[in-house]
Amino acid sequence: MKTTTHLITIIVLLLAPICGYCKHGDTSPLAAYSARWNDPKYRVCNTAEQVGYMTEKEKELIYVLNLARMNPKLFCETVLPRAHDISSFIDTSNEVYYKTLVATMRQMTPLNILQPDSLCMVSARCHATTSGKVGYVGHERRNEKCRKSKYYFGECCNYGSDEPLEILLLLLEDHGVPSLGHRKICLGTYNKIGVAIAPHTTYEHNAVMDFY
């Protein structure tokens, strides 16, 4: 059965991008949080670097997700304490969703890195684009083209930001989602991924991540 969960917490409506975007080269997108992320071994996480059908921010979203999967403990130690600086809507003081995320990532074992997949990307792109045009929130495809191109076993949708690290942190925290579905998908046993970030008439931006 396909897993379909989505993040629709109203707070994302007002998210202001904080996390800066930069081209990678040899510098990790997480280098600002610890120089340890610049270790050459983490370059394998940039699996979408040479992909021509994704934007730079979409590639970066896959990159930071793979970094979190490859070394969840280091991500927990270096990035999560700064989560509120990246998104002001993440409460790092004494909030249950954040605390459970820290506990999970501190003890979990490394996961495989995700490879970009064109079918997942087409699925995500169609949904992000059509949802954005009509201000839709959810997983149901809006037209026959998107229904035919739907390709995922797990899907995460985020509304309000186009900044890769902010998107990832909001999905990982999964505030207001008791099932923690987004967190479980992002840290789940998938192999392939497609990402699309598009304008949204209601929330300014929407991001769709399709996993297979």
Predicted regions and their residues:
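Bacterial Sec-dependent N-terminal signal peptides
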Residues: M1-G25
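Alpha-helix initiation and N-capping motif
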Residues: H6-L7, Y98, K150, L165
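The N-terminal extracellular segments of secreted preproproteins, especially immediately downstream
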Residues: I18-Y21, V44, C156
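N-terminal low-complexity, Pro/Thr/Ser-rich intrinsically disordered segments
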Residues: H24-K57
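Short, flexible segments with low predicted structural confidence
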Residues: A32-R36, P40-K41, E95-Y97, A103, ...
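General secondary-structure edge motif
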Residues: K41, C45-E49, T104, Y151, ...
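Short, well-ordered surface patches within globular domains
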Residues: E49-C146, R183, T189-K192
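A well-ordered secondary-structure block
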Residues: V122, C126-Y212
